[in-house]
A protein has these predicted regions:
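Glycine-rich FAD pyrophosphate-binding loop
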Residues: 28-49
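Helical element adjacent to the flavin cofactor pocket in flavoenzyme catalytic cores
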Residues: 147-203
Length: 402
């Protein structure tokens, strides 16, 4: 267990995944002062970041998400210059596949991505062209595909690790194995956080702890509807998966027709997602993926990637992530002055992390984490108050599986 370096700090960030790491880094860049980064386990090791597929895409069913993704993608592309280190960005191309019933929705969402993309190409292509681009795909049942040539994936663990390294170089202090129990306040202003080993006094507290991130705010009467779901990811051998033009070549892909997602992993392996399920017991180890779950997920993917039917498994991961009712994050000041939330990313936080951290840091530094101050327009749809007000984010052109 790491000792607390500062009993007094200028800011405490709770949560050592990619969101917490990115925000801590941005706060340090802004010269906020002494920053403590707390995590109940090991930073970058046990949370949703380490179980993320790392998909990088502009395509979403809500324009708010598209705009944040478009702001984040250049950071992944220029990671070594902007952050330092290597985030593992690979430009494989991203495709979104739909059946006939969602063809019009795909055109609508692709147009929104085009609007946000600037100079980047976002195309709607037919199954025949899709097959030419990625010979490893079976295109039966696909009516249209949205194709982003500059989409792809990155390595969430590598990205988070380099963010943490950059933050530490700027003076951020890690405190591992420290559970944040409750946010402390006096007269409407944050005074710190009570942890499992004592108190850290600070005028700013950022809760970015994924599935359990909102719990320390409950003591202040702040209820954020974030529920835990178990997420799963598996890796399998597929020679040529990441070799463009090879017989087994596949893109980074979300397939609405089968409810699956997958991507290459290097040249000769691929990752695929296993559907999430509710899991609210936050105090215990997460159950590993079962043989039945893996078989079901592989069978679905084999409808699109025939070679997956016989692909040997190379590894699996499972963990918890926090999901909101509208499957969009909660970002913004809440409750007493000095409390800021960045949680509930619902399986989609990695690709948004650079933009969220940049904009959140501006609201925290320039506005003191006070609601209504230094407002960043791109974050407005994600405010904690939207659920109480009955204004969840509603997809303009929804699919069955996004």
């Amino acid at each position: 267990m790491s000792p607390i370096v500062h009993a007094h700090a200028d800011a405490v960030v709770v949560g050592g995944g990619v969101i917490g790491a990115a925000i801590a880094h941005q706060l340090a860049l802004a010269g906020i002062g002494r920053i403590v980064l707390c995590d109940q386990g090991r930073v970058n090791a046990q949370g949703a970041t380490s179980r993320s597929g790392g998909l990088l895409r502009l395509h979403h069913t809500a324009r708010a998400d598209t705009r944040l993704a478009a702001r984040s993608l250049p950071v992944f592309e220029q990671w070594s210059d902007v952050i330092g280190g290597d985030c593992g960005y690979r430009r494989t191309g991203f495709v979104m596949l739909v059946g006939e019933e969602h063809a019009a929705d795909l055109r609508f969402n692709a147009a929104a991505a085009t609007e946000a993309a600037g100079y980047r190409r976002v195309e709607v292509i037919e199954p025949a062209e899709l097959k030419e681009l990625y010979p490893g795909l079976r295109t039966e049942g696909v009516a249209l595909a949205a194709y982003e040539p500059e989409g792809g994936y990155a390595d969430p663990m590598a990205a988070s690790a380099s963010l943490l390294t950059a933050a530490y170089r700027l003076g951020v202090s890690p405190s591992e194995g420290i559970r944040a129990l409750k946010v402390l306040e006096h007269a409407g202003t944050v005074t710190g956080v009570l942890t499992s080993i004592g108190r850290i006094d600070a005028p700013l507290v950022v809760l970015a702890g994924g599935a359990w991130g909102s719990a320390p705010a409950e003591y202040l009467g702040i209820h954020i509807p974030v529920t835990a779901r178990r997420i799963g990811l598996a890796q399998a051998e597929l020679p040529g998966a990441g070799r463009r033009g090879a017989a087994a070549s596949v893109p980074t892909c979300i397939d609405d027709t089968t409810g699956s997602y997958f991507r290459p992993d290097g040249l000769d392996r691929f990752y695929f997602g296993v559907p999430s399920k509710p899991d609210t017991e936050l105090g215990r180890d997460v159950e590993p993926l079962t043989e039945a779950e893996l078989e079901s997920a592989l069978n679905a993917i084999a409808d699109r990637v025939p070679a997956a039917a016989t692909a040997p498994l190379a590894g699996t991961r499972s963990g918890l992530d926090g999901y909101t009712p509208d499957k969009r994050p909660v970002v913004g000041a809440a409750g007493p002055d000095g409390l800021y939330l960045a949680l509930g990313f619902s399986g989609g936080g990695f690709k948004l992390a650079p933009a969220v951290a940049e904009l959140a840091a501006k609201e925290i530094v320039e506005g003191g984490a006070v609601p209504g101050k230094a407002v960043q327009e791109l974050l407005e749809p994600y405010r904690p108050q939207r659920f109480l007000a009955g204004r969840p984010i509603r997809p303009e052109a929804p699919y069955d599986h996004m």
